[in-house]
Every structure is written in structure tokens, then in C-alpha cells.
């Protein structure tokens, strides 16, 4: 078993190191991650400059490769040029903070898994609710269990899973739920600030609260103490509007 491991928090992130340690007994693990944090990078590729690959020489990250680019860059480089043979699975995470509802459109963590899926590899994105890396050991245990299940009996072929793990001690996690994406309210307005030079700058506002957290959603499952597993697809076609659009064109 060969697993390609990536993230969006950067190669020094605790979530990556803990996930690597949890998955290492399962087989060969290749790590390629961004040099710096790229949260919110979505599926962006770096096209305006060349990319470089480096290798960490010390610490728990020893042997990790890192790229001066985005999460999608990392997986794309690995699968189309760096690796001699394609891995059996792409795993992204563990992200610091949830990726639920519309978050998946912005998430670099999910984007890394999407790139693996686009290139024909089953892929899983793992995120832990809230920030601060509390109970990260529990999240890693959950991630390993899901990866082991996916290896032993793939749910479908190929698959793209978005997994969100409650920020709880392992013994307090109630189990797993297959979920759909919930929905958020619009994000908070941008925050305007004047810098010391008198220039007006803007910070992107916080994500909106859950708008659809009804039963069956990722928001509901995690709020109840369950791990949410959401199967994702990449076809954004609004099929129910096709006929109306065709009539409008005529």
C-alpha cells in the first residue's frame, strides 16, 4: 500500500505529522505538502512561475517533501512527475478547522484530495473541527480507521470523501455518519483597517454560521458528536435547469 499524503496548513503543521505517524504502519507513505500555509487556496495551480521541491532534513518532518506552491500544486506534481508509480490512495489533512458545507469550495485540504481524484486516485480529506489542535490524537485514530476500512473494502471506485472529525477525546466520539453537505449563511463582511502608512487594507471576514444544519448534514452529525463522511462529486451541472435554459435560448 502506497499513500500520498498532503495538506494545506503546510509541511510543519502538527496535523500532517500526526497523520503521517498514524498511517505509517499501513505501508509506504510519501509526503508532499506546501512550504507555507495555504488555507483557502481552493484548487488553484501556480502557473506564473516555476515550482521547487525541497526535503525536510530534521525533526518529525524529516523526509517530508515540500513545495513553494499550493496544495493542488503538490498533488499534481507528485502524480504527474515526481513519483515513479502512482499511489493507491491520496490523503489530505488533518486540517486545523472544519471543512463543511460551502467550505469545500474554498478549502485547500479538500482541493488536494480533489486533485488526486481528478487524476484517478481514490482520495480522502480529513479535517478536525475548531482550531488549536486539541484532541489531535483522537482525530488521527479516526483517520487511520477510515483509511484502513477504505483499503480493505473501498466504498465505491473511485471515491472522493470529505471527513470532518469532532474536536473530542476519542472515547467521546459516538461513531460515523454518512452525510450530505450542509449550508452556511453568507460570510461576515470584510474588515477594513488603516495601516501605519495611512493605506486602507481589508481582511476577509469570518465564515458564516450554519444555515442548514438539519439531520443528515455534516453540521448536524458533528454537532451530535459523530464523524461525518460526505461523498463528493465534481460535476457542478445544475441538471434540473437544463431544459429551462434550453427553452430560454430558443
UniProtKB/Swiss-Prot annotation:
Binding-site residues, a divalent metal cation: 8-9, 39, 95
Keywords: Cytoplasm, Hydrolase, Metal-binding, Nucleotide-binding
Cellular component GO terms held in the UniProt record: cytoplasm
InterPro entries in the record: SurE, SurE-like_Pase/nucleotidase, SurE-like_sf
Coiled coil spans: none
SUPFAM superfamilies: SurE-like (SSF64167)
Described purpose of this protein according to its UniProt entry: Nucleotidase that shows phosphatase activity on nucleoside 5'-monophosphates.
Family the entry assigns: Belongs to the SurE nucleotidase family.
Protein name, per record: 5'-nucleotidase SurE
Biological source species: Cupriavidus pinatubonensis (strain JMP 134 / LMG 1197)
Amino acid at each position: 500500500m502506497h499513500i500520498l499524503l498532503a495538506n494545506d496548513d503546510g509541511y510543519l503543521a502538527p496535523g500532517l505529522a500526526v497523520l503521517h505517524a498514524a498511517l505509517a504502519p499501513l505501508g509506504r507513505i510519501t509526503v508532499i505538502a506546501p512550504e507555507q500555509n495555504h488555507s483557502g487556496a481552493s484548487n488553484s495551480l501556480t502557473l506564473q512561475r516555476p515550482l521547487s521541491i525541497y526535503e525536510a532534513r530534521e525533526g518529525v518532518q524529516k523526509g517530508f517533501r515540500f513545495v513553494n506552491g499550493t496544495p493542488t500544486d503538490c498533488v499534481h506534481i507528485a502524480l504527474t512527475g515526481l513519483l515513479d508509480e502512482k499511489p493507491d490512495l491520496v490523503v489530505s489533512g488533518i486540517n486545523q478547522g472544519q471543512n463543511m458545507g460551502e467550505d469545500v469550495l474554498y478549502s485547500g485540504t479538500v482541493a488536494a484530495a480533489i486533485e488526486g481524484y481528478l487524476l484517478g486516485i481514490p482520495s480522502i480529506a480529513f479535517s478536525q473541527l475548531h482550531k488549536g489542535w486539541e484532541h489531535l490524537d483522537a482525530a488521527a485514530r479516526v483517520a487511520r480507521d477510515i483509511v484502513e476500512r477504505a483499503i480493505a473494502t473501498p466504498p465505491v471506485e473511485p471515491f472522493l470523501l470529505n471527513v470532518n472529525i469532532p474536536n473530542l477525546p476519542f472515547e467521546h466520539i459516538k461513531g460515523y455518519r454518512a452525510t450530505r453537505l450542509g449550508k452556511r449563511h453568507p460570510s461576515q463582511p470584510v474588515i477594513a483597517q488603516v495601516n501605519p502608512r495611512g493605506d486602507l487594507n481589508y481582511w476577509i471576514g469570518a465564515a458564516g454560521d450554519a444555515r442548514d444544519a438539519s439531520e443528515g448534514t455534516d453540521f448536524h452529525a458533528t454537532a451530535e458528536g459523530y464523524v461525518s463522511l460526505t461523498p463528493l462529486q465534481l460535476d457542478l451541472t445544475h441538471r434540473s435547469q437544463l431544459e429551462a435554459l434550453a427553452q430560454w435560448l430558443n
